[in-house]
Design a protein with these regions (language model features):
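Short alpha-helical
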Residues: 19, 39, 68-69, 92, ...
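Metallo-beta-lactamase
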Residues: 37-39, 129-138, 148-150, 154-161, ...
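Short, structured coil segments at secondary-structure junctions
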Residues: 7, 79-80, 221
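Conserved beta-strand hairpin/beta-sheet module of binuclear metal-dependent hydrolase folds
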Residues: 2-51, 170-186
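Residue-level marker for buried hydrophobic side chains located in beta-strands
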Residues: 31-33, 62, 84, 177-179, ...
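Binuclear metal-ion centers of metallo-dependent hydrolases, dominated by the metallo-beta-lactamase
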Residues: 232-248
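Active-site HxH/HxHxD metal-binding segment of metal-dependent hydrolases
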Residues: 49-139
Length: 248
């Protein structure tokens, strides 16, 4: 696991080699965008202390979606007083986590990736970090496409289904920063291919829907994209989407 890295003014990246989550500081308070894997709880207090904060300074955890590598430290932050927010279409899987459906259902996904050694490396890392035992999170507040959330930084929600039914990206307009979750990644963790691209097909509920959701990302105005997997990408959503489409 890595400690917090300031990516831009008041925006911090945390997590591990393969999984990112973020903190956005605004007016002395924090919004967490996603929440990594359960094992990240072990360093949570130290990570926050490193940027001059404590768990009680996190007002909200805004989740791009309900996958287990994005919800891990939610219980610890909620216990410290944070609200939890997610798109209404992912609330059910947040409350009752289990195997994904569609293309990502194990029976469909495994035959497509089981021969890749990187797949087993990634799955091993995530399992050791608690990804196979995600927390059950009840009572989250739900949002919808177009909502501007009343949390530090006031992100605007753009619904981008495909990776999950409720997947959403979050635009912090005053920071010109787009948190893309798993609508885009900047590295394919099964092949190592770098650059903006869709998540690997076997991880998506519907890759065709994820492809269609690129149209919602393309016109957004930002100069920094922060993914759930891979390095920050400096450039416009339009340029990132063009690169992703070129790989389809």
């Amino acid at each position: 696991m890595r400690g917090p890295v300031e990516i831009a003014g008041g925006i911090y990246g945390l997590g591990s080699e393969g999984v990112n989550w973020y903190l956005v500081e605004d007016g002395g308070r924090l919004t967490a965008v996603d929440a990594g894997l359960p094992k990240f709880r072990e360093t949570l207090e130290a990570d926050l202390r490193a940027i001059g904060h404590a768990p009680g300074d996190v007002d909200a955890v805004v989740l791009t979606h309900s996958d287990s590598d994005h919800t891990g430290v939610v219980p610890a932050l909620r216990d410290a007083g944070a609200r939890v927010l997610i798109h209404s279409a992912d609330d059910e899987t947040l409350r009752h986590p289990g195997p994904k459906k569609g293309e990502a259902a194990p029976a469909r996904a495994l035959p497509r990736v089981a021969w890749r050694w990187r797949f087993w490396k990634v799955m091993g890392q995530m399992t050791l970090a608690g990804g196979a035992k995600p927390p059950k999170i009840e009572g989250a507040e739900t949002f919808a496409d177009g909502d501007v959330l009343p949390v530090p930084g006031r992100p605007r929600v753009v619904h981008t289904p495909g990776h999950t039914d409720g997947h959403s990206v979050l635009l912090f307009e005053d920071r010109s920063t787009l948190f893309v979750g798993d609508a885009l990644c900047t590295v394919n963790f099964f092949t190592g291919r770098p650059g903006p691209q869709l998540m690997p097909g076997p991880t998506n509920v519907s890759t065709s829907q994820a492809r269609e959701s690129l149209a919602a990302i393309e016109p957004l105005e930002a100069n920094l994209l922060l993914p759930g997997h891979g390095e920050p990408w400096h450039g416009s959503p339009t340029a990132a989407v063009a690169q992703a489409r070129a790989l389809l």
